[in-house]
Amino acid sequence: MVESIETVIIGAGQAGLATSYALKQHGREHIILDKASAPGNSWRSERWDSFTFVSPNWTFLLPGGEYDGSDPDGFMTRDELVRRFERYAEKYHLPIAFNTQVISVQQVEGSGYLVKTLDKEYHTRNVVAATGWFQLGKKPSFADKIPSSILQFHTSKYRNPQSLPPGAVLVVGSGQSGAQIAEELYQSGRKVFLATGVAPHAPRRYRGKDIFRWLYDSGFIDQTFEQLSFQGREFVAPMISGKDGGHALNLHKFCREGAILLGHTLDVVDGKLVLAPDLKENLGKADMGQKNIVKNFDAYIQRAGLDAPLEDLPVWKDGYQAPEITSLDLQAEGINTVIWACGYTYDPSIFKFSFLDKNGIPDAPLGISSTYPGLFFAGIPFLPSLGSGFFLHVAKNTSLIVERVIGSGHLEH
């Protein structure tokens, strides 16, 4: 059975819901397809129990569902965030087909796209890919060399310390998720080994404001791929947390409090983890990242003539005294769990045509495909700006898409 409909939105996360809201405000025919049973599934099922929103509540800017609570500078829990998605979808009666997995999107010569699900097919003029940028959890190729007696999984499967087998834990990756999970584990009494990367340290608050206020006010997240420096293009979310009122995460502090810091992982040979001797280098990059962040904030404050009291941030050096460990016998160290915090990758496999540019980003300035009429991307960083992946810009991003949909006319049934 083939149903004709003007627009199909794939994904019922924040970008998909915001696009649906805007289309409904204009009376445009559409449907959201989502494989889960409720909206915001990645937040619901791929975040740990104590997860809190990393950006302050005031940044929750779903159009028509902006944060209106009593704590704009606080941080929502996972469950509160999910409840807001549910209430939003119910309040606006958004047309969502849950438990509906899209298996392919094909071009139909001269007349749009054919979207196939396990049960049904849709002929549509417009497809809005709103599945987000962070889809498939990454693991290194040598993950299968980890001894079978050791439990291993991606951060998306982590829930709490109590759910893990007894013993030490190796966390591979020190970005936001890896650092937050490592902190929770060692604070719960676990022995934690943390293989570091190059995510920058950053102050949670600086010169009287939260880091997100400075990122927003300074225009940093408004920059396009072309406008950003190489470091900006390789933007790695800084080590901060929204837990316990919000705080900075710092590898030197982790070291002081008992975590064992390592360089980045290279391989597993005969049950031993092979590590690069680059812990000090990684720490240096993390520290330099913070210096660059605050340097940019200071320059903006001066440029804008703002009255913001000067602040000297604490200087931590503990990690530089840690030994460079290049081989780690997992079983001898009592490590019974490995958590891969290596980030995510985008999965374009449902699309039966190619649309990625040389940088691996959809060729879609403003979220609007340059090559395929009626193909749109919502909620992806750099489409059009870095902030497109944040709640802060979800309304701005989707409004551009909806304007183009409206301008394309209605689908002839």
Predicted features and spans:
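Flavin (primarily FAD) cofactor-binding/catalytic cores of flavoenzymes
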Residues: 2-37, 41-42, 76-413
